[in-house]
C-alpha cells in the first residue's frame, strides 16, 4: 500500500512538471551537404533559442562548434540541443554528420532517438549516404524535408518519386512548392509553399527572415487546382491504411476532399507516421529561410513522444515493458526503476568527463547512487546537465525521454559508451530493493560499432612522449569507440584505426593540436583482418586449485546469431564483428543456485578482455587482428566456491585462447579486406574509360549501369514503383535540362563494388578520366576474403 501511494504522489508531481506527450527526440540525418546544420540553425532561430542565424561557411553555427568543424565546414560529431516550439513542445534535437567516415556518430545517435528528420537535397535527389542512413534508422518514424528548392535543377516531384521507390515508403505531401516569376529575369523562383492541410499559400520575404505572407487559397486563387488535387491525393493515400479517415470522408465531409478537417488529417498523418505506414514530406530552402516553421509544426504534429516510440531492446527478452502516457516506460512492472543508456563520452576542459545518456524509464536525479549493469559496479553521480550544443545547463533531474549528461569525479572510470545504468527513482541509494537477477542485470542491447577500414602508425617523438601519447589515444578512443588502438608485437608499432582517411585526419589533428601529443603519424593504409576458415579444436586448461575452462573458437556464420540457442549468452567484442558465447553451465544458474563468492557478471567481465586480447593478437598470414570469430566458452568451466578473485581465471583464459590459436595451421586462416560500394556519376561520353578503369585497375565488380534519374526497379520495390507512378505530383519548373549533359542525355550512374585498397586516391583518377565531369560516392559494404592473385600485393603493400 505504501509503495502504491508513494508512486501516486510521484505521478502527481511528475505530471505537473513534465508533459511527456509534448516531448520529441529527433535526429537530423542526410547525405553530406544536404543542409542539415543550416536547417538546424534556422530551427533554433525560429524557436527563439538563438537571436542570430549562423552560417556554415562563416563557421559560426551553434551545433558545429569544434574548431575542425568550423574550419572545414562539415559536421564531425553529433551535437545535442533542446528547445521549445510554440511553448508547449520540447524538442531534443541531435544534428548528425553526413560524411560516411563518421557513420558511428550517426549510429550511436539513432540508438537513443525516437524519430528522424531526413533532409534531402532537391537537386541531387536521394543520394547514396541518404539511403544508408535511412536503412540505419529502420524502425524510426521519419519526416522528409526537401531542401534547396531554390537551386537550379531542383526537382520536388522527381525527388519524391525517388523517395517512394528507393526507400519503399508512401509519401504524404504536407506542402508543395510555389514558384513565382521574377519580373527582372522572367524566371520562375521558389518563393514559398502551398499548405495542403490548411489550404494556405505561404510566401516568405527573403529580405526579412521573420516575415511570411499568408493567403487563403479559395476557388479564385491560382493554386486552387493544386490544392484540390493535393488534398485528394493525401486523403486517398491515408485511406489505404486508415479506415477512420475513409468513414469521415463519406459521413462527415460529404465526399468532398476539401471538407476533411485539418484535425482529422493531422491525426491520420500522425497515426501513419508512427506506424511506419507513410512518410510526411515538406519542402523549403533553409539557407533562404523558407519552409522551416512548417517543418517544426510537422515535428510537433506527426512524430512520436517517448511514450509512443519503440521501446529499447533488452538483454532479458521476457521483462515486461509497459507504456504510461504520463511517465513513459515502466520496466519489469517497477515504477521506481530508472534505466538509462550511455551513448557518448566527451572531455570538457572545465567539467572533465561528460557522459551523454538517454533516460528510458523513471527519473534520474543528481547525486544519486547508480549501478552499471554492464560492468557490475555501483557509484555516485554528481550534477546533471542538459547540453545546448557546447553550452551546459545544470538540472536537478532528467525525465523519461530526456537526453542529458552525467558529471562527477566517478563517471570517467565507471561508464563507457554503450553501458546501461539503473538507479532508484526516489531513494538516493535504493539499489538493494531491486531484483538482483533481473533489474541489476538488465541491459539495453549495446551500440554496434562498425569495423575500422584504415590504419595509421603512430610513434612518440621521444621515449618521454610515450606515456602522454598513450593517454591522448585513450581519450580519443574513449570519446570515439570507432577509433581503435592496437599494438603490433612484432614491429612494436602502435596503430590507430578508423573509418576513413578523413576520420584519421581529424584524429591526427586532435592529437597534435588539441591534446598536444608529441607524435609522428605515418601514412594511412588500408586495415586488413584475418578470420578462421573452420572451427578450432576444443581445448581445456585447468589448475590444481580448482580453476577450469574449456573453449573452442569458431568462424562467425551470418545465421549463427539468428539461430542462437536459449542456453547460450552472446557478448560483443568491440568492433571487429567478434563475439564471446557463454554456454549455460551444466550445474550452476546465476539466477537460482549460484554458489560462488564472486558474482557471475565478474566471471563474464574477466573472460571478455581475455577474448578480445587473444583475437587482437592476429592470425598467421599477415599478423592481422581476427575478425568475424566467436570464442565459445563451454558449459563445464569451474572455479573454487570461496575464490575471492577471478584473476586466476583471467590468466588461465588468456593462456587457453592463445594456445588454441597458436595450435591452428596457417591454412585455417584467410585475409579479409574492406570492400566498398561505389556509385560513379558520369556523362555518356565518359562511360567507356570509367568502366574500363573500374574493371581493370580497381578490380571492381560492376553491378549495374542506369540513368541517374531513373529508379532501378527490383522485385522488392515494384509495388512502390507502381505507387510512385500513380501519385499526383506538381510540375518541376526548375528542372528543364539542368541535369542533362551537353548532348542532351541524362548522366549515368555506375554501381560497383571494389576493394578499398584499389579505390585509394580514386578522386583524382575520376577527375582525370572525365576532365572534371565525373563524381563518385563510396561507402562500406563489408569484409571479404582477399583473392589469391592479390594476396602477395596486399601483404607487401601493408608491411612496406
Curated annotation (Swiss-Prot):
Alphabetized InterPro entries for the sequence: EFG2 (IPR030851), EFG_II (IPR041095), EFG_III (IPR009022), EFG_III/V (IPR035647), EFG_V (IPR035649), EFG_V-like (IPR000640), EFTu-like_2 (IPR004161), G_TR_CS (IPR031157)
Chain sites annotated for binding GTP: 30-37, 95-99, 147-150
Gene Ontology MF terms: GTP binding; GTPase activity
What is the annotated localization of this protein? Answer: Mitochondrion
- Record key words, sorted: GTP-binding, Mitochondrion, Nucleotide-binding, Protein biosynthesis
* Domain tr-type G residues, every copy: 21-307
Q: Which superkingdom, per the lineage?
A: Eukaryota
- Which biological process annotations from GO are given for this protein? mitochondrial translation; ribosome disassembly
- On whether Zinc is a keyword of this UniProt record, the answer is no
The cross-references to Pfam families, in alphabetical order and at most eight, read:
EFG_C (PF00679), EFG_III (PF14492), GTP_EFTU (PF00009), GTP_EFTU_D2 (PF03144)
Annotated Gene Ontology cellular components are: mitochondrion
The record ties this protein, via PANTHER family, to: RIBOSOME-RELEASING FACTOR 2, MITOCHONDRIAL (PTHR43261:SF1), TRANSLATION ELONGATION FACTOR G-RELATED (PTHR43261)
Purpose of the protein = Mitochondrial GTPase that mediates the disassembly of ribosomes from messenger RNA at the termination of mitochondrial protein biosynthesis. Not involved in the GTP-dependent ribosomal translocation step during translation elongation.
What family is this protein classified in?
A: Belongs to the TRAFAC class translation factor GTPase superfamily. Classic translation factor GTPase family. EF-G/EF-2 subfamily.
Q: What else is noted?
A: This protein may be expected to contain an N-terminal transit peptide but none has been predicted.
Question: Which protein is depicted?
Answer: Ribosome-releasing factor 2, mitochondrial
**Organism listed in the record:** Kluyveromyces lactis (strain ATCC 8585 / CBS 2359 / DSM 70799 / NBRC 1267 / NRRL Y-1140 / WM37)
